[in-house]
Amino acid sequence: MSLSEEGKIRELIDTWLEASKAGDLETVRALMTDDVVFLTRDGVMERDDFVASFQAMAGNVDLNGLPDIREISVMGDVAVCWNKLRVEIKPHRGTPKVHAGDVLTVFRRGEDGRWRLWRDANLLTAV
């Protein structure tokens, strides 16, 4: 049975969180477009910025992302997802942190038919 387009987006989100938890940068990279942009409270991050940040954390923290998807809308080759996300960050040395909040993500379907993260407005704050 094939997945609906919404199901494919949900699967991508699950894969992203699993790969992030495992420190699997190659899988995460494959889930982003080359021109991905992350809008964060600290400013704009492009692909190279995200990769550098991911590499700095890999092996130094344990991550656990808990999504609460509120809405997914698919319009042709673009999909928008509103997600209430909670991320538990446990440094190997230091105090654990929890960040939570709204995330609005835009995905684009490539010529290969695969969905990839294209724009991400991440409003997580420490809780």
Please tell me what each predicted stretch does.
Residues 100-127:
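Short beta-strand edge/turn micro-motifs at domain boundaries
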Residues 87-91, 107:
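Beta-strand elements of well-folded, non-transmembrane domains
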Residues 32, 85-87, 121-124:
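Short beta-strand segments enriched in hydrophobic/aromatic residues
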